[in-house]
Amino acid sequence: MTFSWLPGQSELNLQQDLLDTAAFAAKHYAATLDARAVFPDQAALAALAVFDESIPEDPCDPSVVLETLATHGGPATTASSGPNYYGFVTGGSLPIALAARWLGDAWDQNSALGRMSPIAAQLEQTVEHWVTDLLGLPKETLMGLVSGSSIAGLSALAAARSHLYAKAQWPFAEKGLQGAPPIHIYGPDSLHGSIDKALSLLGFGANQMHWLATDSEGRLLPSALPTLAPNAIVILQAGQVCT
């Protein structure tokens, strides 16, 4: 296969060239990370105007895309994976994690089903075994991997909601929330904002949420926890982003 805008350039050769260019730019960024300012300067921010363009009507040289990203995008990054960043709780990427992610991107797997990607299914199963072992959960525990903590909170609350409705013999799948038995939510008063949003997405109103006192480390005070009815969900945390 050749590309009409790059006469004689094969797809394979172009892909190799692009990967080499991206790898070079990434290595340079990683090598200079320690010396980078945490936040870009005004010149770098002003240079972002190069990306403010109309949707192109014709294709362009892919190498120009990478060059533009490296030249104007790289300096406008926040060095959150570097040693001088003390902002949000943002973990730096380990070298092996970054390299493995590159490889995973090249594999470009659809992991919806095990048959669609045996390696993705195997890795997820291995992580499942590790987590259940670390937490002392039953061996028959099943787990699903999500994109991050916000979706994890949403998924956990959805599972808790379904469990309570099943115990109350409410056919949630057929009738939904309309007319469903009330559920009350109890949690620390310093919960992450994503929990509020997750509860709202799941159909819980403010009157169903009861926020309880915490100590200076964001831990729930046991004395603040009331006697719970069977229709209650308790949200706990070991701390929060400021502790």
Regions found by a protein language model. Name each.
Residues 221, 237-243:
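Active-site core of PLP-dependent enzymes with the aminotransferase class I/II
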Residues 90-104, 108-233:
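PLP-dependent aspartate aminotransferase-fold enzymes
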Residues 2-140:
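N-terminal entrance/gating region of PLP-dependent enzymes' catalytic architecture
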